[in-house]
Curated annotation (Swiss-Prot):
Protein's UniProt name: Ribonuclease P protein component 1
GO cellular component: cytoplasm; ribonuclease P complex
Keyword annotations from UniProtKB, A to Z: Cytoplasm, Endonuclease, Hydrolase, Nuclease, tRNA processing
Organism annotation: Methanococcus maripaludis (strain DSM 14266 / JCM 13030 / NBRC 101832 / S2 / LL)
UniProt temperature dependence: Optimum temperature is 36-38 degrees Celsius in the absence of L7Ae, 48-50 degrees Celsius in presence of L7Ae.
Keyword Transport assigned: no
Compartment(s) where it occurs, according to its Swiss-Prot or TrEMBL record: Cytoplasm
Known catalytic reactions: Endonucleolytic cleavage of RNA, removing 5'-extranucleotides from tRNA precursor
Protein purpose: Part of ribonuclease P, a protein complex that generates mature tRNA molecules by cleaving their 5'-ends.
SUPFAM superfamilies given in the database record: Rof/RNase P subunit-like
Amino acid sequence: MSQNILRHELIGLNLEVVKSTDSGLISTKGRVINETRNTLVLEKENGKEITLVKEISTFRIQFESENVVKIDIDGRLLVGRPEDRLKRKIKQLYSY
């Protein structure tokens, strides 16, 4: 599932920042409403939009299908245009 997230459409998913070099972004939550090569745009619960830089954060993404699944993903893996992520081979940042 975690490798499939890199090929998944992020717009419409709920997302939370769990780690970031910008401490003011940690715990920011919202729904992804737009994605560019280097950023994600979230709509927070109060209706405000916030732009997040992918490279400096780790995100907790929530999927809702038969049951709720939450996955933490390093933003560096998400850098790139959404359509190009489908074509790109996945580099492993961490060895498990």
